[in-house]
């Protein structure tokens, strides 16, 4: 006796899938404003500030453009040593998932898949700029998503309280 669990059309539900159709550099900028002085050895490590953002936009019914933006700046005191900005995108096909799973997929799973490639591009850019490669620590996209949802909830509550008091 066999059990047929595969979808064969005729109304059978398709298994959920997440596919990367394309990956691309949307924007890359490296600035070394103090070169060549900025390349000299220093007594202490520079301070590094990193900002991360994720955006997702629909392209078609099941296709989405997800862009992971990484901005990193190294400073020695008040002097900027380098500034690197990367917008790294991926086109994802998402099908068979319940609607309530779409935002977490687009803002957690998709950037998690893009991150290793974006990290390598940033490391190569800083190395090619004359600095040691900047190896960005892994990012907790689930925590970022939770924070973003909490901020949007607060904004919505403030907007609702402003409309009810006017």
Curated annotation (Swiss-Prot):
The keyword Cytoplasm applies. It is found in: Cytoplasm. Keywords: Chaperone, Cytoplasm, Protein transport, Translocation, Transport. GO terms for biological process: protein folding; protein tetramerization; protein transport. Its main location: cytoplasm. The keyword Transport applies. Gene3D superfamilies: SecB-like (3.10.420.10). GO terms for molecular function: unfolded protein binding. GO terms for cellular component: cytoplasm. One of the proteins required for the normal export of preproteins out of the cell cytoplasm. It is a molecular chaperone that binds to a subset of precursor proteins, maintaining them in a translocation-competent state. It also specifically binds to its receptor SecA. Homotetramer, a dimer of dimers. One homotetramer interacts with 1 SecA dimer. NCBIfam families: PRK05751.1-3, secB. Belongs to the SecB family. This is Protein-export protein SecB.
